[in-house]
């Protein structure tokens, strides 16, 4: 148990080391291009079931963290996220693509005019926001057959304020914490499994 505790401490230090490297990259924002973001949605069953699609691509990057959120008149809700990273963020950069999908259900028209924001971060970040429009007239008998609507450039609206600041460090900390957390959990799970097997012998 003592060894496991020491190893966990080492893992935490290593994770914090990775945090410093990536946070520095976020602060200077150089070395790779911001992720590309594309979005689409379907509003089915008389505008009761809203399905949102968010594709994020980052090239030649140490990692990609992406997510989506929706802002209705009364509240903002974080929907989903995904993280992929290189084991050697300093030297090994890859091409990443995330395809996020999330479905929301509510009374007819609940999410009409709500704003949806999709983003991706690889040390710098890209984000896009659109307003949900009714699809009642785009369905077959207004029941269940809807056409996926791909969001066009002229449909985009301003991103929320924290995406527009010249200094995004506070927001970047939230996203990059996901990367460190995933690394820590994977390593901690491995240590626990190794310790358990050793004591079984």
Swiss-Prot record:
Its main location: host cell. Residues 1-25 form the signal peptide. It is a single-pass membrane protein. One of its GO terms (cellular component) is membrane. Residues 192-201 are cytoplasmic. Glycans are attached at residues 46, 49, 55, 84, 95, 113, 122, 137, 144. Residues 26-170 are extracellular. It is found in: Host membrane. The chain crosses the membrane at residues 171-191. Keywords: Glycoprotein, Host membrane, Membrane, Signal, Transmembrane, Transmembrane helix. Belongs to the HHV-5 UL120 protein family. This is Uncharacterized protein UL120.
